[in-house]
From Swiss-Prot:
Molecular functions (GO terms): chitin binding; structural constituent of chitin-based larval cuticle; structural constituent of pupal chitin-based cuticle
KO phenotype (gene knockout): Larval lethal at the first instar stage. Hindgut development during embryogenesis appears normal but at the first instar larval stage the hindgut protrudes out of the anus and probably causes the lethality.
Listed name of the protein: Protein obstructor-E
Gene Ontology terms describing biological process: chitin-based cuticle development
Disulfide bridge map: C54-C70, C124-C137, C203-C216
C-alpha cells in the first residue's frame, strides 16, 4: 500500500511539473521572448531551453503563447525589453537589418531598407515621411527627424496674415486648428496646415481643390482652376496640330 502511495505521489509531481513548465520553457516546445533583451529568445525542445539571438537589427515578436519569430519591427515595440545586442553596422546601415531614415531632414519621404548590411532606398507615398518610431509612413510634422516645411516646399502663412493669397478656410479638430490652402503650382493638390505645419493632399483625376467647400471638386465647379484647365487644353491642342508646309518662293 505504501509503495502504491509513493508511486502515485511521484506521478503527480512529475505531471504537475510538466504542466507548469519552467521559467525558460513555459511549454516543452516553442519559442519564447527571453529576459530583458528584445532581440533574443529561448527555443525549447522537449523542455530543454537554448538561448538564441535574432539577426542584428531584427526583433523577436511573440505571436502566440508558444510561437514567435524574428521580424522587422520598430524599437518602440520593445518596451521593458529594452536591451539589444551590440550593433554590427556597415557604412550604409546602422545594423544589418531594419528600416532607417536617410539622414536628410528635407528628403524624409525616402528611407533605407537594410538587409545583410546593404541598403536599398524605398519611397513613401507622396507627401508622407518615414517614421522610425512606428516603421510606417506618416505625416511629416509627426516625424521628429523631418523638416515638414522644407520637405513639402510650403510654409503655412501666419493665422493673422493680411495677404489675400493667405486667406484660408478654417476647421477645428482634436489635433488643433486646420487651415486649407491650394497648392501654389497646381489645382490638383492642397495643403492642410495643422497647428502651423503643412500636410499635402492630392485630389483624384479630373478633380481640383475647391477652397470654398474645402473638398476636391469637379473643375467646372472651381472657376479659377477651370480657366487654367481650358487654357492648358488649348495649348496642348495647338501643339498637336500638323505643321503646314510653307510654299517655296
Amino acid at each position: 500500500m505504501a509503495k502504491i502511495l509513493i508511486s502515485a505521489l511521484l506521478c503527480v509531481a512529475m505531471f504537475g511539473s510538466m504542466a507548469l513548465g519552467s521559467p525558460e520553457c513555459p511549454t516543452p516546445n516553442g519559442r519564447f521572448a527571453s529576459g530583458d533583451q528584445c532581440d533574443s529568445y529561448t527555443e525549447c525542445q522537449d523542455g530543454t531551453p537554448v538561448e538564441k539571438l535574432c539577426p542584428d537589427g531584427l526583433l523577436f515578436h511573440q505571436r502566440t503563447k508558444a510561437t514567435g519569430e524574428c521580424t522587422y519591427a520598430p524599437y518602440s515595440t520593445c518596451k521593458e525589453r529594452a536591451r539589444l545586442q551590440p550593433a554590427n553596422g556597415t557604412e550604409e546601415c546602422p545594423r544589418q537589418f531594419g528600416f532607417y531614415p536617410n539622414g536628410d531632414a528635407t528628403k524624409c519621404g525616402v528611407y533605407r531598407n537594410c538587409a545583410h548590411g546593404v541598403a536599398s532606398l524605398t519611397k513613401c507615398p507622396e507627401g508622407l515621411a518615414f517614421n522610425e518610431e512606428t516603421y510606417q509612413c506618416d505625416w511629416p510634422d509627426l516625424v521628429e527627424s523631418c523638416n515638414a516645411e522644407a520637405y513639402l516646399g510650403f510654409n503655412c502663412p501666419a493665422a493673422d496674415s493680411a495677404d489675400d493669397s493667405a486667406a484660408a478656410a478654417v476647421d477645428v479638430s482634436p489635433e488643433g486648428e486646420l487651415r486649407y490652402y491650394r497648392h501654389p503650382q497646381t489645382c490638383k493638390k492642397y495643403f492642410v496646415c495643422v497647428n502651423g505645419h503643412p500636410r499635402l493632399y492630392n485630389c483624384g483625376k479630373y478633380l481640383a481643390f475647391n477652397s470654398q467647400t474645402k473638398l476636391c471638386d469637379f473643375y467646372n465647379k472651381v472657376p479659377e482652376c477651370y480657366a487654367l484647365l481650358k487654357e492648358k487644353q488649348r495649348l496642348k491642342a495647338e501643339k498637336q496640330q500638323p505643321q503646314v508646309a510653307q510654299p517655296e518662293d
